[in-house]
């Protein structure tokens, strides 16, 4: 059963060097997602909150073929340095993983 990961992040890229580092992350990350059968469904872009008071900054949605594939992505030792870089450049405000159909 597929799973979807949805996250809302606050970026800390006001400094040019941080923006450049985040650009490197954005270029590298899809390779590691794909290694585990994952794909990006959305990555940033315009957001319209239709109901509620949620104020997302940057929303990313990934699809993986299974929870096991998602979990293996999250602990991939090759992805670890990139994950650490992302963590230094952003704060994850919300992250959910849900089963698909």
Language-model segments: what does each one mean?
Residues 1-58, 65-71, 98-101:
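Short S/T/G/P-rich N-terminal loop/turn motif that feeds into the first structured element of a domain
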Residues 87-101:
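C-terminal end-helix/capping segment
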Residues 70-71, 78-88:
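C-terminal structural segments of small proteins and small subunits
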């Amino acid at each position: 059963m597929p799973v979807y990961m949805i996250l809302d992040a606050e970026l800390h890229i006001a400094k040019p060097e941080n923006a450049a580092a985040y650009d490197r992350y954005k270029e590298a990350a899809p390779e590691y997602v794909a290694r585990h059968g994952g794909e990006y469904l959305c990555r940033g872009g315009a957001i319209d909150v239709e109901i509620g008071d949620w104020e997302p900054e940057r929303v990313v949605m990934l699809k993986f073929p299974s929870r096991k594939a998602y979990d293996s992505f999250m602990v991939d030792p090759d992805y670890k340095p990139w994950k650490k870089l992302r963590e230094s450049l952003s704060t994850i405000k919300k992250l959910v993983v849900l089963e698909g159909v």
